[in-house]
Amino acid sequence: ALKAGSALVDMEFVQFHPTGMVWPPSVRGILVTESVRGDGGVLTNSEGKRFMFNYIPEVFKDKYADNEAEADRWYKDQENNRRPPELLPRDEVARAINSEVKAGRGSPRGGVYLDVSKRLPADEIKRRLPSMWHQFKELADVDITEQPMEVGPTCHYVMGGVKVDPDTAAAYQVPGLFAAGEVAGGMHGSNRLGGNSLSDLLVFGRRAGAGAAEYVKSLASNRPTASDKEIARAHSHLNEPFTRDGNENPYALHDELQNVTQDLVGIIRNEKELIDALVKLESIRKRAAQVKATGGRAFNPGFHLALDLENMLLVSESIA
């Protein structure tokens, strides 16, 4: 949309889920349900300390326990005890984990530990958290009934996107472009509330469909067409990864892009790190022009990633 001339809004606002898998690399970012913490899972740093007690905001201190004894009692007596700080809102937990990792108290793979094995017996964990037990066993070879999980904040939702008319979902400055859902911006302000994405899709998805239909009707016989030259240029661009002389690996470059944005354009940002990020993104952009793809176009993830990198870099720069 940006390449076509559309305006974007709120691109700096990115929501992070506090607990995503951090290992192995192939599954990094897959969500770890909040039910783990709801069923007694505790967050600890590399020193074995439950650090969330150090990150309770003043506004929440009357509702969240400031010591382990009270926090543990809450699971059996919620009326007479304050909640464990692991159950603070997503943003607070994500910032706390990020702070621990940046302070050098993270796990070896850049996260923290989430442990439910000391709270519940093995059969109870499998009954209450069957998907999490299976997820970690199959993807990370970790048995959560006996071992802690390594988790860290993961990019969850981008509040920014295409600037659209709220009634028709039509994009400004690009006639014929309609956007709804996460690709559109301005709906959720700086932070989305849980569950609102589905409502957004239902309401504005319908408006986008109706708006597009009305737009097409208004064109009558004056519908725009793409010239043969434009089609040939798009086709040539599509095939570029196969014809390049470079030898950059799309997977390695994608991994580097993820690390740069996670480390420098993540939950807590400052001017120095953002400037550093933009410099590194420009370097990755130059190397992305040398990404080489092999094989055919169908069912070829490397080829698809080579094409996606161009847009990923554009989005990353917009956020930074």
Question: What spans do the regions from the language model cover?
Answer:
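Acidic, metal-coordinating catalytic segment for phosphate/diphosphate chemistry
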Residues: 1
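Beta-strand segments within the central parallel beta-sheet cores of soluble alpha/beta enzyme folds
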Residues: 10-17, 149-150, 222-230
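Glycine- and aromatic-enriched mobile tails/lids
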Residues: 44-64, 81-88, 92, 96-105, ...
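Accessory "access/gating" subregions that flank catalytic or transport cores
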Residues: 123-175
